[in-house]
Design a protein with these regions (language model features):
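Catalytic acidic motif of RecA-like/P-loop NTPases
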Residues: 113-119, 124-127, 131, 146-147
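A short helix-turn-beta junction within AAA+ P-loop NTPase domains corresponding to the substrate/partner-engaging
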Residues: 151-164
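A short beta-strand-to-loop transition that corresponds to the Sensor-1 phosphate-sensing loop
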Residues: 114, 141-146, 163-166
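Sensor-1/coupling segment of RecA-like P-loop NTPase cores
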Residues: 118, 133-153
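P-loop/Walker A NTP-binding region and its immediately flanking N-terminal helices
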Residues: 1-114, 138-140, 151
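Conserved adenine-binding aromatic site and its adjacent loop/helix in ATP-hydrolyzing domains
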Residues: 96, 128, 155
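ATP/adenylate-binding site constellation spanning eukaryotic-like Ser/Thr protein kinases
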Residues: 73, 91, 123, 146, ...
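Conserved catalytic/switch belt of AAA+ P-loop NTPases
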Residues: 99, 124-141
Length: 167
């Protein structure tokens, strides 16, 4: 089974059994190739048309999916490395933003791309956020190799691997 199909099967199971975790570490082969899969996972969590009888994976018809596709969904924050690092100030800013309630009365999601680029200071800052999650917040951390992420972060996340091979 190819990795994309396997990934969609995993996220479909998460939805079907209503087992949404507060934090995911998604291990990818290629950020660019796998990014749409990550956005589809976000849509599955947030889509206004998603219910137990109807799955939404990239429906493209509702406001939420359209806003996610255009990068304008207010309760989705994407953190990218600043140069070669994810810095403490980025994590502090994220925490401040997510201390407020959702503007849309829905889940709030943050994605940390290349989370293996967190230094010890930024990892410690986000760790407390992962240890004491708000009910309406979901973290999605993306790494090309989970073994490059600090153990305390890994231990607080559900791991989903899209890699073509396991180490």
């Amino acid at each position: 089974m190819n990795n994309r199909v396997q990934f969609y099967k995993i996220i479909d199971n998460i939805s079907s059994f209503n087992r949404l975790s507060h934090a995911y570490l998604i291990e990818v082969d290629n950020y660019d190739d796998d990014y749409q899969c990550i956005l589809d996972f976000v849509k599955l969590i947030l889509c206004g048309r998603n219910d137990k009888n109807s799955k939404c994976l990239n429906c493209g018809n509702c406001n939420i999916c359209s806003q996610i596709d255009s990068g304008n969904y207010v309760d989705l924050k994407i953190i990218e490395p600043d140069g070669n690092l994810i810095r403490k100030k980025q994590m502090t800013s994220l925490q401040e933003e997510f201390n407020n309630k959702s503007l849309l009365d829905n889940k709030r999601i943050y994605i940390i791309e290349e989370c293996e680029k967190m230094n010890q200071s930024s990892a410690n800052t986000i760790l407390k956020f992962l240890e004491e999650p708000e009910d309406d917040v979901v973290a999605i951390l993306i790494a090309d190799n989970r073994y490059h992420v600090i153990d305390t972060i890994i231990s607080r996340c559900q791991i989903i691997s899209k890699r073509k091979f396991c180490l």
